[in-house]
């Protein structure tokens, strides 16, 4: 059996190896960037006591860039290398459509990062003296509310705009997301 300390060091190294320059994380080596990976990194690192400013540096900006024009959250956002817009990194658009599962993971990550970043500057914040990008939580709330189906649909939730309701979104788009969104609105 591997001692806990050795396991934690190896886990930290592995998580850090998945980190991308824009603060996002890939799901596995050679894999895609996904906000769910950021959520998993936060959960694992906090549970193991290995969450450091270096690990979360840039993550809040990445999560906020996943917000779509609708107010919901997509799986990822273009990086500066993928989207050359001549502007600041903040202008990188989201990659994909807003989705209930992604929104839940992104909001839970954002709330956690708001709490962690309160008085804990990350390395890039120390260098640039800028505050992390904010998510438009009011817009996210409007999008989340619009995902509830009509009475004829049983009042259930859909995961994406103009899609059918689905039972799994009772958690992602219903109880889980609204609880996290409410907490984030109170923290901000």
Where are these regions (language model features)?
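Amphipathic alpha-helical segments within extended alpha-helical solenoids and repeat-rich scaffolds
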Residues: 13-19, 63-72, 137-152
